[in-house]
Swiss-Prot record:
ValRS has two distinct active sites: one for aminoacylation and one for editing. The misactivated threonine is translocated from the active site to the editing site. A motif ('HIGH' region) lies at residues 48-58. This is Valine--tRNA ligase. It is found in: Cytoplasm. It comes from Haemophilus ducreyi (strain 35000HP / ATCC 700724). GO terms for cellular component: cytosol. A motif ('KMSKS' region) lies at residues 560-564.
Length: 961
């Protein structure tokens, strides 16, 4: 080497990462090409909430996405990773409502709708970019100039377009149906926003008197009805029994007198009833229970709504027919002393009144799940409200076929069944929400209640020929957030305009997401996309070809991470590190329950206590590459992941290993990259072959979305082949090889390091770029960034099975000698004589050709091959297959120690022989196993038995000393 090359002792991630990322972004490396001839590869990122900050789930999924994007960019594909954030209607509105309440003592109603929405936009401008900045810290190679927000003008236009077209096609309608109602937030919420909490409740058994003198089979003049919700009694419109329940056969079609309300309601038969639950008789309240609502539809029952939007008892019941229209012929009176009562107060009063009327039969303890709104924090109430709906069955049929016929693949495949189960039992989708923040529904009303749907008010007037002075009022509701995010893959590419981006990048390639939103988001994207996006032949396009479903990231004990458990880990803290004091503040600050905070603090202090290397406690800095590599290495298909700080630490060490290996190569003053004759060694050929096999393994793993196997292939090659063996195998060449051998090894070292960096780059972008910028000059490679270099391919000509086999055998010999040293407590510096016996002719040639390598690696003075029958001096022996590896004992081996070691080796081989004998004596195994398998087992047993004989002979010889 003509000049000394300097390289820092260690990789300082904190000094490198952000500057590198800024450079990448400024240079426009993340931007896709505009050349339509280049094959495209596109991933649309699941848009995180604009309110949010990066959590481990984001870091996990985005690491996998960026790995695919960087790999495909290096493959020469035109890559687009479409990023953006979701306006997150209810979550964002609540954040800003809490903010103005805390800072100004005001509510949104004090501001009014327009001013409050402006407040949200101000908040979004100030703090809405937090998550985007954190995504940069992860190294995400996103074209940020294309970042989208679901409330952008372009996306808002797409939302209006979809709404209007679906309405014109009769697939969007307005109707009164049962929804999850949050009585605190005054909005309908989706099933995803409902949290079912285990609760110790009661099962009340009420007596409903039979009408007209009718009696039960056992002579009673009443039915006992079991319920967990007495407060809805006033809304009952039937009681139901199972059609095959013999106890009540004679009563089907008769009536009972509803207590408190004093109206007759029918006894109906329906298979929904569980004969084993309670008494086998249940009350049917179609206006206040989802199952009862379906029963009511089947039996054309009226619906009696007895609750206000606050979940208080109404002054006057709202009575509707099964079609959702007012039913004036049905009388449902609410007693005066119930009117205005809060629902749980009403519950107590109903129970007390039944007891006073001698109609309370019994109360039993009952475990149940109570549905809570995850934002409002109060029990939700099934409520009949006027809402907008999408009739999704026609869309679902097409979307189901796309998965059935393989246009869309789920990985792992079992999630297809979950998808099918939802899609084949799909219900109309309530898309309206009683919020202010979101896409306002493009519908207007005149004073007569007529509804007009169009993109704008001006379009309404033109379309329906309405005079300018006719007052119109826009619908107050906004659309469910999932409605706009359902358009994500095509609205972000410019639809409804037929943009070049839409033509180039749609269909996208893969969606990486969690199983919990397969229905709420994935299915709706498939439905909407296939309905609105068609190819040039009119065939519906799918939004993506593959859905890769990830598991959850859990804590080390397998618990779900949550603030209330105090076990949340921030990915940025994994990267930068955090002191114990700051971690405690982050985990316990602003907690409502001080007792819980102390428990969390105690657990955190124990888990992240001070250590000699981290005197302040907390979490050490690991850098982004170590975090990404850990996430990839843990990404086993579809399984939840228990986070492991030890693995993170191990992969930080792996980054250091790669850095140190690079230092060894680049600062080696014997490196000779001059032109001239080259003579490649066996080790050179072996490492090239091993590398190419690793490239094949990595590529295959990525094709199967086995990120764990891809990461492991890099780790195994880098640590166990390149660093632990090849770098050591080069030292004898540089010390004693010819000029041609030194040149060959130098070129192999540099070339292989450069290719290895390219192989690892998709998972570990920062350290590979930093080293590559140094190594490219040595390797004679032109280019501005490693990410723009080609990804390594499998070079078939460099696959060399013979070289791999020979090196692996030599490694076994070296390991055998090293083990003898360790077990006999011989100093590493002590040079040894080596004897080998029972070698084949080919093995003898390998030994002869690699004397330099063996003597250096095993610290030997000589290597001698014993001929058949030639006696060896008293030696310590190891077996490598049939070959005996012998180190003469003279002067440095303890007799007792060696006898103990031999005894242990003999026992080990005895156990192997017994295991095989047991297998071969098993008639079922012998009958079913192929002959080749049986022959292989017998050959192994013969080899072990031969080994035992040799070791026993050695044992006897030493014992006789």
């Amino acid at each position: 080497m003509t000049q000394k090359f300097e390289m820092a002792d260690r990789f300082d991630a904190s000094a490198v990462e952000q500057a590198l990322y800024q450079h990448w972004e400024e240079q426009g490396y993340f931007k896709p090409s505009e050349n339509p001839a280049v094959p495209s590869y596109c991933i649309a990122i699941p848009p995180p909430n604009v309110t949010g900050s990066l959590h481990m789930g984001h870091a996990f999924q985005q690491t996998l996405m960026d790995t695919l994007i960087r790999f495909n960019r290096m493959e020469g594909n035109n890559t687009l990773w479409q990023a953006g954030t979701d306006h997150a209607g209810i979550a964002t509105q609540m954040v800003v409502e809490r903010k103005i309440a805390a800072e100004e003592g005001k509510t949104r109603h004090d501001y009014g709708r327009e001013a409050f929405i402006n407040k949200i936009w101000d908040w979004k401008a100030y703090s809405g970019g937090t998550i985007s900045q954190q995504m940069r810290r992860l190294g995400n190679s996103i074209d940020w100039q294309r970042e989208r927000f679901t409330m952008d003008d372009g996306l808002s236009n797409a939302v209006k377009e979809v709404f209007v077209r679906l309405h014109e096609q009769g697939l969007i309608y307005r109707g009164k149906r049962l929804v999850n109602w949050d009585p605190k937030l005054h909005t309908a919420i989706s099933d995803l926003e409902v949290e079912n909490k285990e609760s110790k409740g009661s099962l009340w058994h009420f007596r409903y008197p039979l009408s007209n003198g009718v009696k039960t089979a056992d002579g009673k003049d009443y039915l006992i009805v079991a319920t967990t919700r007495p407060e809805t009694v006033l809304g009952d419109t039937a009681v139901a029994v199972h059609p095959e329940d013999e106890r009540y056969q004679s009563l089907i079609g008769k009536t009972v007198l509803l207590p408190l309300a004093n109206r007759e309601i029918p006894i109906i038969a329906d298979e929904y009833v569980d004969r084993e639950f309670g008494t086998g008789v249940v009350k049917i309240t179609p206006a206040h229970d989802f199952n009862d609502y379906e029963v009511g539809k089947r039996h054309a029952l009226p619906m009696v709504n007895v609750m206000t939007m606050n979940a208080d008892i109404r002054q006057t019941a709202e009575v509707l027919g099964p079609d959702g229209k007012p039913l004036n012929t049905y009388q449902a009176i609410i007693p005066a002393d119930y009117q205005g009562l809060e629902r749980f107060t009403a519950r107590k009063k109903v129970v007390a009144d039944f007891e006073a009327l001698a109609l309370l039969d019994e109360i039993k303890p009952h475990d149940l799940k109570v549905p809570y709104g995850d934002r409002g924090g109060v029990p939700i109430e099934p409520m009949l409200t006027d809402q907008w709906y999408v009739s999704v069955k026609p869309l679902a049929e097409v979307a189901t076929k796309a998965v059935e016929n393989g246009e869309i693949q789920f990985v792992p495949k079992q999630y297809e069944n979950l998808y099918f189960s939802w899609m084949r039992d799909i219900q109309d989708w309530c898309i309206s929400r009683q919020l202010w923040w979101g896409h306002r529904i493009p519908a207007w009303y005149d004073e007569s209640g007529n509804v007009y749907v169009a993109r704008t008010e001006a379009e309404v007037r033109i379309k329906h020929n309405l005079p300018l002075d006719l007052p119109l009022t826009q619908d107050e509701d906004v659309l469910d957030t999932w409605f706009s995010s359902g358009l994500w893959t095509f609205s972000t590419l410019g639809w409804p305009e037929q943009t070049k981006e839409l033509k180039m990048f749609h269909t996208t390639d893969v969606l990486i997401t969690g199983f919990d939103i397969i229905f709420f988001w994935v299915a709706r994207m498939i439905m909407f996309t296939m309905h609105f996006i068609k190819d040039e032949n009119g065939k519906p396009q799918v939004p993506f070809k593959t859905v890769y479903v990830t598991g959850l990231i859990r804590d080390e004990q397998g618990q779900k991470m949550s603030k209330s458990k105090g076990n949340v880990l921030d990915p940025i803290d994994m990267i930068d590190g955090i002191s114990l004091a700051d971690l405690l503040e982050k985990r316990t600050g602003n907690m409502m329950q001080p007792q819980l905070a102390e428990k969390i603090a105690k657990a955190t202090r124990k888990e992240f206590a001070a250590t000699p290397t981290l005197p302040a406690g907390g979490i050490a800095a690991h850098g982004t590459d170590a975090l990404r590599f850990t996430l990839a290495a843990l990404a086993s298909n579809g399984r939840d992941i228990n986070w492991d700080m030890k693995r993170l630490e191990g992969y930080r060490n792996f980054c250091n290993k790669l850095w140190n290996a690079s230092r060894f190569v680049l600062t080696n003053d014997k490196l000779d990259l001059s032109a001239g004759e080259v003579e490649y060694s066996l080790a050179d050929r072996w490492i090239e072959s091993s590398f190419n096999r690793t490239v094949g393994e990595f590529r295959e793993a990525l094709t199967q979305y086995r990120f764990d196997l891809a990461a492991n292939a890099i780790y195994e090659f880098t640590w166990n082949q390149f660093c632990d063996w090849y770098l050591e195998l080069t030292k004898p060449v540089f010390a004693n090889g010819s000029d041609a051998q030194k040149r060959a090894t130098s070129k192999t070292l540099v070339s292989l390091l450069e290719k290895l960096l390219r192989l690892a780059h998709p998972i570990m972008p920062f350290i590979t770029e930093e080293i590559w910028q140094k190594v490219k000059h040595f390797a004679g490679v032109e280019g501005d960034s490693i990410m723009l270099q080609p990804f390594p391919i499998v070079e078939q000509a460099k696959l060399d099975a013979d070289a791999e086999q020979q090196i692996n055998w030599l490694k076994e010999l070296i390991i055998a000698v090293r083990n003898i040293r360790a077990e006999a407590n011989i100093a590493p510096s002590k040079a040894l004589d080596l004897l080998v016996r029972n070698v084949t002719q080919q093995q003898a040639v390998i030994l002869s050709e690699n004397q330099l390598l063996l003597t250096a690696m095993a610290k030997l003075t000589s290597i001698s091959v014993l001929t058949a029958g030639e006696q060896a001096p008293l030696s310590v022996a190891k077996l490598v297959g049939q070959v005996e590896v012998l180190v003469p004992m003279a002067g440095f081996i303890n007799k007792d120690t060696e006898l103990a070691r031999l005894s242990k080796e003999i026992d080990k081989l005895h156990n192997e022989v017994m295991r095989i004998e047991s297998k071969l004596s098993n008639e079922a195994f012998v009958a079913k196993a192929p002959e080749a398998v049986i022959s292989k087992e017998r050959a192994k047993m013969a080899e072990y038995q031969s080994g035992i004989e040799k070791l026993q002979a050695q044992f006897k010889a030493i014992e006789a000393l």
